[in-house]
Amino acid sequence: MGSRLNLLAMLALLAPAAPAAVQLIEGPTPIPGGNARAAHDLTVVNERLAFALAVGSSPPYGVPRGALIDLAPVSGGQIGPDRVVFADFIPNNWSAWPNTYQRVDVLERGPDTVRIRAVRDFGQARIETLYTLAAGADRVAISATMTNEGAAALPQLLSGLTLWPSSGFLFPLPGLAGVTSGSATGALARRVSAYDATWTITLHAPYAQQVGSGSRDLFLRHTLAPQESRTFSGWLQVGARGDLAPVLEAEIAQQQLPAGELSGSLRGAARDARADFVVVIEKQGQPYAWTRGRAGHYRVRLPVGQYSLYATARNFARSTPLSVTVSADSARTLDFSAPAGPGRLAFAVRDARSHAPLDARIVVEAGEQPVVEFLGRRTFFTALDPPGQLEVPIAPGPYRLRVTAGGGVLAREEHVAASVRPGATTRRAVDITRTFDPPARGWYAADLHHHADQAEAVTPPADLARSQLAAGLDLLFVSDHDSTANHAALAALARARHVPFIPGIELSPSWGHFNAYPLTPGAALEIDTGTAPVGAILAAARRAGASVVQVNHPFIPYGYFSSVAAGVAPGGFDGSFDLMEINSTVPEDDARVLAQLWQYWNQGRAYYLSAGSDTHDVWNEQSGRVRVFVHVDGPLSVAAFAAGLKAGHAYVTYGPIIYPATMFGTQLPAHSGAALAFDVGSVAGLSKVELIGDGERRETRTLEGAPVSAQVSFAADPRLHWYALTVEDQAGRRAYSDPIWLSTPPEAHLP
């Protein structure tokens, strides 16, 4: 009854004629699609926004309870869909979070202000976070104080607030586009915005000196002496329209910046452009912000400075850019001429030999690439049905496009020029010659770390399928964080395209991630990965049907092997996994993964290689950037693929192809004359081949003339225990193999 009364009170609060007020609701959140569903979770709502704290629910990524996990705009008395998976403080990058307690207290209950305090521990540190929402405010104030209660200093921490959206697009710190992690020096503002056409969420973090995860994490690097405290203050600003003008207004007010106003109109434009156009604002040659016009007019306040502005709309060209100097308290008029309207672009992609249609990925290399991503894509995929076909609206103008079928592994990419005119369709037919056909020799590829649209991932199942097929992968695969929600949809898509589907999950505690697959149809996560020790997590994977468990990105800050080394993995080291992952988001860790596996092979332990791209967004990341090839005897099936992978009949590759005369994971036959022979290749041309024996480089062959394919053979030293191969091509891409044993292969791990 209490929960129902709270909901009725909230509805009264959100009525258009209601006075400004803020309401606290205990229980499952009323935010549509929200994840705070437990009896004691807290939702705070006013007439501009709603947010929810996980008190009883389990936050994502193994973060302790007491965190902000839902956030949504409110417009016209209606709460919009949840737009975040997590937006809160993290104490030391995405590393393990050792935790023993959480307390959440309500300090003020409204109607003018709601203030909530969450207290949690992080090892020897105490973290107290205050969340404040006032009536009528469009932003949540967050203040996190971290205190070292231990006897030793906590050095070189990367602490700060984060914004992990669950949908839409991300506009990183202005001036830092393309910077995944590192210094925020050069940033034009200390804010990051998640957005789509109907909403914005902006994290303002004035303290930020470092960025992580492509500006989703805004950090300060610091050291906490014993008993020392440091406070991190920021704001989560929410809007019900994809417009950054209110964000600029808030930034000006928060920092007390001198500012002026620009306003104007879009002259001569068609009705659809005038109704909903965008003015993009650049500063120092970098995208800085944008504002959306209404009925042909716009208005925006900007800090004092020099800017360049242009107008555009969905699939429209850009207007001629205009330069302007904004001075304090100025008010200037800046009108734009109408940009050219949309054209269409159509592709037909096929195999040059058989003329069969090919799934393809098409990327704009040169031409219009909208800064505001809801105005148009830069990456496209051919249709699932009919395959090989694409037709899309696009801004007019000249283009250079890169077309790939096979992810640059099976065939060379093609570069296509096209000129698109307003109101017309430009058609291009592209024939692609496949250089390699691994399935003809029993080799099949998959990307064994790939997300769809759960948690922070933004790829619907159909687009995952289009992307993986365009990469030339032979099996579809998904591994969403702690979720099996997309299994049924992807199974149906795979059946329609007559390809196998491997249903997986990424088990995601704060101290290490594990992919488990193939899962039993209908299986769901049975444990809380935020509190369970490693043994319970791996056991749950096996109960769900997984014959294969791989350790994902083992050596990143929150990777399992890093956490074991730091003593923060609950349960310590548990060896009941099967594979270690080469992850293309951290290629600098490849050598560490290989060194660990080589050590295991020296010990006669049957842990083998896996590979995954860790793709979350197929339009801005590449499925199959690294992939695993597995040899299967007979017809391809999920069970046969998993068995071959687990038996070490595999190699991982960023590009080169390997066909061994003696199968990886098996024993070199005595009658072979102790010779190791391989066919190798790469569409980019080969550079060198390295033979690894017992963990050391035994021989390197440089391949002169950059051949596309070659045969190499080596004499085997019978005193060694195993050999493996590394192949590098002219593009610097590598392939790494599982071992060929010179003695009886060790037994694979039993599930």
Model region roles, listed by residue range:
Residues 141, 306-308, 344, 398-400, ...:
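Short, conserved beta-strand segments of beta-strand-rich sandwich/propeller modules, principally
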Residues 427-476:
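An acidic-aromatic substrate-binding cleft motif
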Residues 304-315, 362, 396-407:
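A short, solvent-exposed beta-strand micro-motif common in secreted/extracellular proteins
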Residues 44, 51, 140-148, 678:
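Short, well-ordered beta-strand segments enriched in hydrophobic/aromatic residues
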Residues 268-270, 326-383, 390-392, 404, ...:
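Charged catalytic cores and adjacent phosphate/nucleic-acid-binding surfaces used
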Residues 24-32, 36-38, 43-45, 56-58, ...:
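Beta-strand-rich recognition/accessory modules
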Residues 136-175:
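Acidic (Asp/Glu-rich), glycine- and aromatic
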Residues 36, 86-137, 149, 211-216:
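Extended, loop-rich substrate-binding clefts of extracytoplasmic carbohydrate-active enzymes
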